[in-house]
Amino acid sequence: MKTEKGMVTLAYLFVHFKEKITPDGEQVYFAVSKDGLNFEQLNGGEPILTSTMGEKGCRDIEIVRLHTGGFIIITTDLSIAYRMDENYQVNWKEVNSTGSKCFCAWRTPDLINFSEQELLPVGREDFGCMWAPEVFFDEENEEYLIHWGSTVKGDNFTHMIIFCSVTKDFKSFSEPVPFFAKDNEILDSHLTKIGDTYHLFYKNSDRPPMNMHAYSKSLYGPYTHDEAFEKYMSTLEKPGAYEAPTSYILPDGRWCLMLDFFGCEKEKMGYVPFISDAPGDSNFKMCKEKFSFPYGFKHGKVIEITDEEYARLKEYYK
């Protein structure tokens, strides 16, 4: 299979974290797959990267293949294991209102050699915690759009929407502005482009609590709500227990949407694939084929990698 940029793609990398009560879970983990449905852990299931700055934890792991070569990994700067008692009084409202206004980041040319960790100062002083950064490369303007969920002081940190900022180098960033907002609270935005259409997946926290899909011919919208997608999501058992969307094209050309399910015992939590017959067709259905993970992957990103990259990762992290 070839991507739109012509890269021969024969495998997949899934970056993610683990939901554990110990701090080693909230770090950066790698897994790989040849078919996009059955993943195997790398590095013996131990972290690839460990945060030593900010909150000393990484959640909501994002990875981007840079158009100039190499990759950047960006994460939410948050450790529930380290900080929930000390900083947040076991209160998620405190997390939302007083959490980090930076993102953790590492740069790498080859997914093996990494730069020193950085804290990216993207946020504003009036932001609460900045959740789930994701990056979209705007080819027309040759810049990266970073989007994430945050509350703000002006509404007493009660209404999360999707903000965005643009950068060309992940060193300087434009002033954050709203990217997508609704009357209800939303989070976990995932943005992809197929053909000439932009597809935005996100999670409604309420009214109703479930994953949504919207689409537009323009990167900055307006986005049209996909009622058929909402109708199908509403038929799932515990529709509000899915979050953290990430999507990619399978080797046979079908479109895979991964959703992180947390509506069960912790040992069984993790991603579930939903499959559409063709890219751009949002008629997703829960996967009936075999899929497997060595443990429950939590909020992460799947990217396409070459067979050479796959072999190199397997050899280095064996």
Residue positions per predicted region:
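Carbohydrate-active catalytic/glycan-binding domains of CAZyme proteins
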Residues: M1-K318
